[in-house]
Amino acid sequence: MTPVTAYTVVFLASASTLVLEIVAGRILAPFIGVSLYTWTSIIGVVLSGISAGNYLGGVLADRGGSRRVLGLILVGGGLTSFAILPLATPGLTTLVPATYPGVLRIVLLTALLFLAPSLLLGMVSPLVVKLTLADLGRTGRVVGRIYAWSTLGSIVGTFLTGFLLISAFGTRRIVFGVGLLLVGLGVAAGARPLRRQGRLSSRKPEIAEGLLLLLVLLQIHLRDGLQSGCYRETDYYCVKVHAERLSDGRLIRALELDHLIHGYNSLEDPTYLHYGYLRTAAALVDRLGTRTPRLHALFLGGGAYTFPRYLEAVYPDAVIEVSEIDPAVTRTNFEMMGLDRHTRIVTYNADARQVIERMLTGRTYDLVFGDAFNDLQVPYHLTTAEFAREIRNL
């Protein structure tokens, strides 16, 4: 194997591994949420797969690893990447008993999706080293360069996915693209080298088999495997909106971010409050409103904008500001959740702490309503004593 081929293979294989690792959080979010436990499980499972793959790849290399073996491993990595898509459905959570401890369930569900491709792609570098080494006197330089290109691929895959690919294509198309890339790379890497006399004929069987495999996979996955089930997939959430009819005939809509419903709204009646805690808050604000000529309220987290809409309807003179980190959530509220496009509510699409520290210095509020959630918990940086002091100074 030539150095250029070796560097290309390890670069793309490692980039694919990190692409899958980054999208894992978004793939799993609708089923188990995104928390410290989720990301700990993802990182641990992927690293375990890479470690086991490095070991097994070394064993295969010593037993006579060939280009065909390398090609099969890459194709296997592509196929197990494709397998993520049909598995990542609401039925995924039924594969691990609900009686298992929560953290163990998260680890096992993560492993079901991402351990196999991580393991197979971890086998690539040791095999490439074996296929590239021709002179033991250059072992250090060859191994060093191969692992440098491998690490560079991981870096590029990380930044490219987090900053560009998810926003541009969505997670399922990314996983599908990784699968196609790996299958194509496996076919190319496993094919016999061109002969000077035979030209392309020596590769025709492998190329034909690879193209047929790609066509079959395209047919299977383009039918329904690329459908995420999200109304909108953002950099932060899988956003879903669904309608429900109450026993009194009232039609309401629910805004679901990942696997947590953030609010129910009536499109016709902005004063409708579905949750008891919001009705309690409304009663407290009513007492506050009688003592305040013009209510000035700040909401940390917009969600379904349920309570901001309520205040806008009940207190026409109120000044209402919302810090909502995800602009796509705000757009969804305009489109689907009844937020008036001519609303007086002022929205800052930024992190709540940054909004307070950088944009609201010197302002005062009658009410600060904390409604920011990341999965089932309040983001840590919004729970610190320092942040509480900043709130008190508003």
Each language-model region and where it sits:
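Alpha-helical transmembrane segments of multi-pass membrane proteins
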Residues: M1-R232, A243-L251, H259-Y264, Y275, ...
